[in-house]
Every structure is written in C-alpha cells, then in structure tokens.
Amino acid sequence: RCQYHPKALRRYRGQPSPHGSNPHQIKKGLSPMEHKNCLKKVTAVFSSHEAAPIWKLRHFAVLALLTEIGGELHFILTKRAAGVNQPGDVCFPGGHREQGETLVETALRETEEEIGISQKDIRLLGKSDFMLTIYRGMIQPYIAYIPYEIYKTAVPNPKEVAEIFTVPLRFFLKTEPERHDTVWKVIESPDFPYEKIEGGKNYPFSKSKTTQLFYEYNGHIIWGFTAQVLRNIIEILNESKLKF
C-alpha cells in the first residue's frame, strides 16, 4: 500500500508506545523502500491502462442512407413521430447501441425497425466523422446505399417515424446552411455548495457557444445533429477534390 498506516497506539497502562516517548508522534511519509514499491505499483497499473472517457459515454449510430432517383443521388431522411423525443425533427434512421452490438449493427437494425428496409438490402459504403455531444453521447454516422426499387418499399414505423422523404445530394453540395449561435451555460441546483468554491456565487462558470446549422428544403427544416452530419459529409466530399 502506498500510504503508511502505523499500528494503533497502545493506550493501556504499562504498555510503552511504539513511537517513543511521545505517544502522539506518528510516522509521516514513506520510507525509501516503500516509495520504491509504490512507484512500481503505479507504473504497473498505468503502463497497461487504456485511456477511456472519464464519464461513461452513451453510444449511438445513424445511417446516412442514399438512393438514386432520376439519375442523381438523394439522402433518405425521416421526420420523427409525435410520441418520441424531439418530435417533428428531421433525422437519419438510427438510435442507441444495445448490449453486444457494434455501432454499424446498431445503424442497420434501427434502419430496419424505423423504415422497414431489410439489412441485407443495404450496401454499406463507409462512415463519416463522429460527434461528441454535451449530453455525454457519441454518435457515429455510417454512409450506405439502397437501389430505388428497395427505397419504394420503405414503410415508416408509426411509433417512431411520421414521414420518409428524400433530398438530393446536389442540394447540400450547392447550398450553404444558415448559421445561428446558441450558448450553453451552467445552471446550478438550489443546494449547490457555493461556499466550497473560490468566488462563491460569483464563480465564473464556463459557457459554451455552438453554431447551429439550418437547411430548408420543400418545407422541411433540417437542423441540429442531422444538419451537422450532412455538412460534415459535404466537407469530406469537397476535400476529396472529386467532382460531384
């Protein structure tokens, strides 16, 4: 053990103190040997430790699904049903990873559950960049393709999806999103122990500014995480120097 724990002082009459004439004098610090052993143990632990988030992350995956309509690629998007979180928002099929799943398995399963497209009919193309949210979530988008004949068989699960529609890839390639800033700030609970921190109630808690992106297409507002993912996909395509 790294911390030195002396034996309890003998307080019975007639028994000498193990610490000399002063019974309240306690040995402090580590001996050279104890220090060396402690360092070995710390080294053994951290030399093989794999770094991970201090806060446990919730993992999600979505499928940026493409199909071909009239000779050009379209993204398949959904509008969330009234009975789920963020009702009415436009999003990709996807959801929370279940125990034992890989993230790509999550994306494929959720797509089948939400819009009825069989996993065997989906051609996986790759993945775009992932996003870390302020809610301790990690969201991984995957890029995939289905033929138009398969897309026509898509049926929204009414418990989760109100509508399925498509937007041309070309629209996002040629359209700059609107940008609006939001500021996230700390709101302390009523019993927050201000007396324990320097500055008390005047402590300068950090604020976080986030730029929200907005696309509008045929009456649909696409914003939030979905807009961020679409913009990231477009940036990756543009960085490739290929013509689309």
Where are the predicted features?
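A glycine-rich, hydrophobic loop/mini-helix early in the fold
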Residues: 73-97, 101-106, 111
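Short, positively charged low-complexity motifs
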Residues: 12-20
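Entry/capping segment at the start of metal-dependent catalytic domains
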Residues: 31-54
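Conserved hydrophobic "DFG−1" position in protein kinase catalytic cores
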Residues: 65-67, 77, 144, 166
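Unchanged
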Residues: 96-222, 231-232, 236, 242-244
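Short, Lys/Arg-enriched N-terminal segments with co-localized hydrophobic residues
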Residues: 22-32
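Conserved N-terminal beta-strand and adjoining loop/helix that marks the start
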Residues: 52-75
